[in-house]
């Protein structure tokens, strides 16, 4: 019988930190051009998935998107919310494919998972959300979204690999014994 696993305090703190970084990078330090948003906030969600697992990555993407909508005064767009969740889930699900490889294999695996996620998330779900929910013309915004994809995918891949192969990864997923909350009976 398998034991139930719960998130510990360390995991929740890192999730909150990555959500906060995502919010700053996507809502404050951003170039917002209507249907196009140039930001690197998705790197935080990708790292949450790679470091803490696909569920934590998806939760970070969900929370960051919903809180970000409240910060900017937008209504929550379900297509864009699914896209934000995918940024945390898909690279984490691809991690077993490259986890046991050398650094070059891991780098290629991370970059391929980011490109696949960007195609599904940015080009399909986010574009669908802009067209269906906000009324943008698909043929008018698709060329710009392809350019955005071509520019942001390598930048996201480079930043993710830079942070993933840093000492920060050892600190987040290291063998440090995390604090455990135990229920006390009175």
What are these regions (language model features)?
Residues 1-186:
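Loop-helix junctions at membrane interfaces
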């Amino acid at each position: 019988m398998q034991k139930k696993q719960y998130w510990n305090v360390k995991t929740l703190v890192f999730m909150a930190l990555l959500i906060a970084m995502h919010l700053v990078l996507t809502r404050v330090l951003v170039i917002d051009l209507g249907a196009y948003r140039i930001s690197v906030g998705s790197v935080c969600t990708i790292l949450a998935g790679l470091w803490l697992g696909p569920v934590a990555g998806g939760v970070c993407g969900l929370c960051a998107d919903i809180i970000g909508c409240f910060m900017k005064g937008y209504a929550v767009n379900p297509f864009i919310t699914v896209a934000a969740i995918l940024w945390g889930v898909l690279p984490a699900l691809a991690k077993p494919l490259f986890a046991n490889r050398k650094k070059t294999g891991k780098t290629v695996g991370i970059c391929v998972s980011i490109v696949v996620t960007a195609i599904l998330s940015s080009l399909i779900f986010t574009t669908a959300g802009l067209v269906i929910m906000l009324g943008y013309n698909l043929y008018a915004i698709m060329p710009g979204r392809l350019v955005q994809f071509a520019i942001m995918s390598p930048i996201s891949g480079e930043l993710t690999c830079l942070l993933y192969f840093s000492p920060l990864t050892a600190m987040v997923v290291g063998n440090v014994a995390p604090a455990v909350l135990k229920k006390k009976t009175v």
